[in-house]
Amino acid sequence: DQNGNYQSCEHEIAGVPLLSAMLSRIGAGKDMLAYCENMCRLHMRTHICFYMNLGEGQTNLLFDESICPHDLVLLAVCDARGKGGCTEKSDEEEQFLKERLAAYEKALSMPMPSGDMLIAQGMKAGRGMAQALKEARRLRLCGAGLEDAIRQTVIKFGKENDHE
């Protein structure tokens, strides 16, 4: 714009190959590359969660994709503050993200569905179990109770894993 503020649409996607190339040149290891790529890919979604006022379930799922949710919040806060000053809502966004991170950590402290729990409700062990567990975790992080997440998963994936 005329004030010298630049925005790069989809920089979180376009930046990943550049980031990987740069870090590889300086000898970053595989774990460091994975961490930095993950942070780069996800950091703009934190802003979307704030500006669209998405629910806890959505921020829980975002944080669950992150290698380090705490660092993702710190990166988003730094990104919002940009050139050293605060954006109009950067303090509010920081508070929002910290509250959502606390909600995510609380959700993680609650029991999560296990393969044994799904099997006890009639699912058969097999190739579909990993996908079923992923779905049960997603439901739990979105606010479903433990029993409800298990029940919905068994209904969706079938007691016999029919769609393997």
Regions found by a protein language model. Name each.
Residues 1-88:
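Divalent metal-dependent catalytic cores for phosphoryl transfer on phosphate-bearing substrates
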Residues 21, 81-164:
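Charged substrate- and nucleic-acid-binding regions of tRNA-handling and nucleotidyl-transfer enzymes
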